[in-house]
Amino acid sequence: MNLLINGLALLTVLLAMLFFLIFLGLFALYIANKKAFPKRMLITFASCVALFLALMVYNQYFFTFDRIDKAHTQQVARPVESPNGAFTAEAFYEFYGGVLGGVNVIVEVTDNKNVETKIIYYAEAKAFVSLVWRDDETLAIYNEDYNRNPNDEVVLNVSNEIYHDRGLACQSVLLRKKFKTCYEDNK
């Protein structure tokens, strides 16, 4: 879905640039020869710009994790069950961009009682990923580089907190309703 929206946005920008160049040519003719003002071309260009802006707003403020392609994920380690057995946490790698791309890490928590699964952590993957339950509802996620920086730990209450390193989940109107607190990387 995200690829479709980004492709449509790119096509819209290219069309807007083409229409803008045509508009500039017609506007130059209007100035030089007093031809009719190119209203239709101006309206077409403005429509392309409006469509592009609408797609960008949709992409930014209506973000969901449904856009993750599960076919391109790989489980990092075995699932880790909470001390009371109410939740199970799993970490996955999401590969993107082919040879020149990268890897994101996703932590998904399943409520074993209601059999509901939700993503609570999404970030650029580093060298080591591990999950440790602190108590029945608190999960520590270590996404560490080779230097073992102590700031690479994120502790979340799995019931109502979420982390997205780029902040898209924090800006999303749809995800804000599901989570009480949202964290993002402030680097």
Question: What do these predicted ranges mean?
Answer:
Residues P150-K187:
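C-terminal partner/receptor-binding element of secreted or periplasmic proteins
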Residues M1-A32:
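Membrane-embedded alpha-helical segments of integral membrane proteins
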Residues L55-V115:
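N-terminal export/targeting and maturation segments
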Residues V80-G85, S130-T138:
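Blade-terminus and WD-like Trp-Asp/Gly-His loop motifs, strongest in beta-propeller folds
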Residues T117-Y121:
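A short beta-strand motif characteristic of beta-propeller blades
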Residues A123-A127:
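Short coil/turn segments at the loop-to-beta-strand junctions that recur within blades
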Residues R40-F62:
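Internal/C-terminal transmembrane anchor helices
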Residues I31-L42:
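Membrane-interface helix-boundary motifs at transmembrane edges
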